[in-house]
Swiss-Prot record:
Organism: Psilotum nudum
NCBIfam families xref list: PRK00405.1
GO CC term (a single one): mitochondrion
Compartment(s): Plastid, Chloroplast
Protein name listed in UniProt: DNA-directed RNA polymerase subunit beta
EC number: 2.7.7.6
InterPro entries assigned: DNA-dir_RNA_pol_bsu_ext_1_sf, DNA-dir_RNA_pol_su2, DNA-dir_RNAP_su2_dom, DNA-dir_RNAP_su2_hyb_sf, RNA_pol_bsu_bac, RNA_pol_bsu_CS, RNA_pol_bsu_protrusion, RNA_pol_Rpb2_2
């Protein structure tokens, strides 16, 4: 239990603390721990000794700023310097030098890492905690077996099993097991030690008598263990190398518990082993056998392996410390080799001559580049960044695999309550394996998840953090009251949680109370208003789609929210705050100048048109004016998708739930052209194109404006250096960078020179390899720059980056969604005069299908749009905490109807609230002017445009690449692929009798090599399209496959003539 200093009221914890605290733990503890563990290195004669003075290490301040690291495509890191001492005992000479060990990537102020200019994040991994866990499992005959699983700190494991005949086995894999007696003897115990160290000696004595082989000594046991482990048959003689191999393979990988794992057997088996003893001892094994036999007799308890007390979080600190340990191991081996070679060749030794920085640099580079939990930061909007940093994954090295993970692992466990969100998880094969931290959850130094509760004892008031093992022993009342009601006991009986069950108990028996209703959910789920009225599946989709919302050109604050929007925007780092108190003296789009009281000024630079990882535009907008006096912490500028310091990924749109000529069938959505003309759903996207300039075998590639092979029109935007001019509007096919590549002259042979002289051929010694605007890439050029990467010496390459800004209005085919999982595709854009309009003449902006509500059970969208309508007319914003039914029944409905009624009275619009059909009003058809037959639900809903846009997905292919083996078109937009015609498509064409189209698709358009070239000529010349006259390539491939199986397949044409069958070989 951890007590907090603050009393009474509470503040929300920082949402990105899990990343910062992990890195802080690595820098303050893990780094020094690993450096101090670095061993003394001596030569074979023990005359030369090398030692690192780990406690005096220094980290140099980075030579580059965070934003410059992204701009210049380099790694944001700090150089590590450690003093080292080299002692030569023969002449008693000691040399000390400060060594450069390498660079360690630093965490940025946003809680991320910048590797080669790319923003990355380390996802926290939740794994089984090391220790021993007892369970009951069925064997292959479905007979229950009691097992004790010992999980090591490395993730390796082995099992102790007791079967129906009271035989105890040690199992390393499904196939291999051996008697526990063999293992105990191999550990160095004698028969007397074993029998004296257990509570059930008779069972072990009986087991000894029933052994197949007579094992008398430790050496015999080691040989038996070695033969079993490596499946060796025949006679094996004992040697020291066998002992070392077993120690390395078995004992080190499966017996090392670590500091965290040591606590588990101490508590479970009532042992007093010191916590710094990280390996499993023989006495631990004897106690574990005793407990296993006790469980067989009904004494002791089984463990729930999915309980959070048996799982821990591996955060940034664990990952980086593990990589540093690996790098120092490589360095140790390198020093030993260098020292051995130098002494052998009688060279002088210095500390700098022994240590190289390569192990540290390559280890971290490989880790951040290839580890599955080092991921591209999702930068679609600030919420996506925040959720990505708080993600928990059970996948990755040392974790589970998505193919073998069981339903029990994926399911919601009662211990998740207040620690892991029960709603937000991945859809599909990763369901339950990728989860998200709850709002008030935090990770302690040992990796266990804690949740906060409010102590309601009479003598003191404070907030406590309970671990998953602790909160089972307390009765905890659910979050059924707000902070303003703390201390009152208006309910004599309350609902409480005790030992993973819900009980109704007297108020005096409650130990703790939940802080507030949203503490059980993640950030994404907590931003959904009226969450309690939605089905959990739709709430999951809603939290996912908020992450996918594209920042808009003109964002707007939501009318109906939950109150967490400001905290998300603040903790994501997307808003800019003043660092000191002062007065604003200068403001423009790129800089804000603050004057302090002592006539000093501070300049705050704003981000303008920066590309995110997801190609969205990051831009900051100043929200204060010159002359404003500010205090420390006040807002200076809004960032991407924020308004007034609150998250704003969408717009408040006037929606109607009604069918309209079938155009909103099956989640299709009708929109008004007002959304286009007024840039309601217009977003900015930045695409980056790059081209390398290399030194080839034929010469250096040249960047130039003079490209003889191309038309001057496509070169019109190039400057004298061959780069595109900033501010140019470029279209598909325009050249962005003019480049000529030297090529080998094919006419240098004697016969080539003769032809050149006869025909007067001018030989082109270069070919154009320009960077051109691809299809759909038109836009405004906002930046063009040379980038000199860190590995420039390796491949002699320099890179040019061109950034193009696109302004995308909403189109047919774009995906839009609300916060309740109500998503759809834009099917038609209507003129505003044709849209249905309200009784005051306001045309509706969007028409949604009413059938999308009852079956999906996301009624929260109806509450939101009706309350939004009232707020729009009364110029109010609402921040509603979910689960307001704790105050009274139907509280949400009463609130919405009371606000609508007040709005109709204040604005003198009686149609806003009509008692006969509350929440609905009569709409007028914009085309005819008639009133619709039924009243329609109309309101202001907060809708978002998602990143799934038709511009990125639409694709057409006239001709393109073919696969080498099947000769069929490739698959996918990125490869300029074709449309797949599968079984169902063939059936559809067959059912309509479209024989010629079907034949074309299966032959001419696909893999009929000769015929497809003839088709192109026939289309150009206007001749009839020829029929295929031979077998397509896929059938030839099938024949070859069958022949490889020694099956010869011939195909014949059978015709009946004069009542005789005649076979012709095709």
């Amino acid at each position: 239990m951890i007590l907090e200093e603050n009393k009474g009221m509470f503040a929300l914890p920082g949402f990105d603390l899990i990343q910062y605290e992990g890195f802080k733990r690595f820098i303050n503890q893990g780094l020094m721990e690993e450096l101090l563990k670095f061993p003394k290195i001596q030569d074979a004669d023990q005359e030369v000794e090398f030692l690192l003075v780990g406690d005096q290490y220094k980290l140099r301040e980075p030579s580059i700023k965070e934003k410059d690291a992204v701009y210049k495509c380099v790694t944001y890191s700090s150089e590590l310097y450690v003093p080292a001492r080299l002692t030569q005992k023969r002449n008693r000479r000691i040399r000390e030098q400060i060594l450069f060990m390498g660079s360690i990537p630093l965490m940025t102020s946003q809680g991320t890492f910048i590797i080669n200019g790319v923003t990355r994040v380390l996802v926290n991994q939740i794994v089984r905690s090391p220790g021993i866990f007892y369970s009951r499992e069925p064997d292959h005959k479905r007979i229950p077996l009691y097992t004790g699983t010992i999980i090591s700190n490395w993730g390796g494991r082995f099992k102790l099993e007791i079967d129906g005949r009271m035989r105890i086995w040690a199992r390393i894999s499904k196939e291999r097991k051996f008697s526990i007696i063999t293992l105990l003897l191999a550990l160095g115990l004698t028969r007397k030690d074993i029998l004296n160290g257990v509570c059930y000696p008779n069972i072990l004595l009986d087991l000894w008598k029933r052994q197949d082989k007579d094992i008398k000594s430790s050496e015999d046991a080691i040989i038996e263990l070695y033969k079993n482990l490596y499946c060796v048959s025949g006679d094996v003689t004992f040697s020291e190398s066998i002992r070392k191999e077993l120690q390395r393979k078995l004992f080190k990988q499966r017996f090392e518990l670590g500091q965290i794992g040591r606590r588990n057997p101490n508590n479970k088996l009532n042992l007093n082993v010191p916590e710094n003893e990280s390996f499993l001892l023989p006495q631990d094994l004897l106690a574990a056998i005793d407990y296993l036999i006790g469980i067989k007799y009904g004494i002791g308890t089984l463990d729930d392996i999915d309980h959070l007390k048996n799982r821990r979080v591996r955060s940034v600190a664990n990952f980086l410390q593990g990589q540093l340990r690996l790098a120092l191991t490589h360095l140790e081996n390198s020093i030993r080799q260098t020292m051995h070679k130098a002494i052998k060749r009688k060279r002088s030794l210095t500390p700098k001559g022994l240590v190289i920085s390569t192990p540290l640099l390559t280890t971290f580079k490989e880790f951040f580049g290839s580890h599955p939990l080092s991921q591209f930061l999702d930068q679609t909007n600030p919420l996506a960044e925040m959720i990505h940093k708080r993600r928990l994954s059970t996948l990755g090295p040392g974790g589970l695999t998505r193919r073998t993970a069981s339903f029990q692992v994926r399911d919601i466990h009662p211990s998740y309550y207040g620690r892991i969100c029960p709603i937000e998880t991945s859809e599909g094969i990763n369901a339950g394996l990728i989860t998200s931290l709850a709002l008030h959850a935090r990770v302690n130094d040992y990796g266990y998840l804690h949740s906060s509760f409010y102590n309601i004892s009479d003598d003191e008031e404070h907030i406590v953090y309970l671990s998953p093992a602790e909160d089972e022993y307390y009765r905890i009342a659910t979050g059924n009251q707000l902070a303003s009601n703390w201390g009152t006991q208006e309910k004599q009986v309350t609902l409480a949680r005790y030992r993973q069950e819900f009980l109704t108990i007297a108020w005096e028996q409650v130990h703790f109370r939940s802080l507030f209703p949203l503490q059980y959910f993640s950030i994404g789920a907590s931003l959904i208003p009226f969450l309690e009225h939605n089905d959990a599946n739709r709430a999951l989709m809603g939290s996912h789609m908020q992450r996918q919302a594209v920042p808009l050109l003109k964002p707007e604050k939501c009318i109906v929210g939950t109150g967490l929007e400001g905290q998300v925007a603040l903790d994501s780092g997307s808003v800019t705050r003043s660092t000191q108190e002062g007065q604003i003296v200068y403001v423009d789009g790129a800089k804000i100048t603050l004057s302090l009281n002592d006539n000093e000024t501070i300049d705050t630079e704003l981000i303008t048109y920066k590309r995110s990882n997801n190609k969205t535009c990051i831009k900051e907008r100043p929200i204060i004016s010159t002359g404003t006096y500010l205090k420390e912490g006040q807002l200076l500028a809004d960032g991407t998708a924020t308004v007034g310091g609150e998250l704003a990924p969408g717009r408040n749109i006037l929606v109607a739930y009604m069918p309209w000529e079938g155009y909103n069938f099956e989640d299709a959505i009708l929109i008004s052209e007002r959304l286009i003309s007024e840039d309601i759903f217009t977003s900015l996207h930045i695409e980056r194109y790059e081209i390398e300039v290399r030194i080839t075998n034929q010469g250096i590639e040249e960047i130039t404006k003079d490209i003889p092979h191309l038309d001057s029109y496509v070169l019109r935007h190039l400057d004298s250096n061959g780069l595109v001019v900033l501010g140019s509007w470029v279209e598909t096919g325009d050249v962005l960078v003019g480049k000529l590549t030297p090529q080998e002259d094919s006419l240098r042979a004697p016969e080539g020179k003769l032809l050149q002289a006869i025909f007067g051929i001018q030989v082109a010694d270069t070919k154009e390899s320009c960077l051109k605007v691809p299809i759909g890439g038109q836009g405004r050029v906002i930046d063009a720059r040379w980038v000199y990467k860190e590995n420039i010496l390796i491949n002699n390459a320099k890179t040019i980056h061109i950034y193009i800004l696109q302004k995308r209005k909403i189109r047919v085919g774009d995906k839009v969604a609300g916060r309740h999982g109500n998503k759809g595709i834009v099917s038609k854009i209507l003129p505003r005069q044709d849209m249905p309009h309200l009784q005051d003449g306001t045309p509706v902006d969007m028409i949604l299908s009413p059938l999308g509500v009852p079956s999906r059970m996301n009624v929260g969208q109806i509450f939101e749009c009706l309350l939004g309508l009232a707020g729009d007319f009364m110029q109010r914003h609402y921040r509603i905490t979910p689960f307001d039914e704790r105050f009274e029944r139907e509280a949400s409905r009463k609130l919405v109807f009371s606000e609508l009624c007040e709005a109709s009275e204040k604005t003198r619009n009686p149609w806003l609230f009509e008692p006969d059909y509350p929440g609905k009003s009569r709409l007028i058809d914009g085309r005819t002017g008639d009133t619709f037959e039924q009243p329609v639900t109309v309101g202001k809903a907060y809708m978002m445009k998602l990143i799934h846009q038709v511009d990125d997905k639409i694709h057409a292919r006239s001709s393109g690449p073919y696969a080498l083996i099947t000769q069929q078109p490739l698959r996918g937009r990125s490869r300029r692929g074709g449309q797949r015609v599968g079984e169902m498509e063939v059936w559809a064409l067959e059912s309509f009798g479209a024989a010629y189209i079907l034949q074309e698709m299966l032959t001419l358009k696909s893999d009929h090599i000769q015929a497809r070239y003839k088709v192109l000529g026939a289309i150009v010349t206007g001749k009839p399209i020829p029929k295929p006259n031979s077998v397509p390539e896929s059938f030839r491939l099938l024949v070859r496959e069958l022949r490889s199986l020694a099956l010869n397949l011939n195909y014949f044409l059978i015709s009946e003539k004069d009542l005789e069958r005649e076979m012709k070989n095709v």
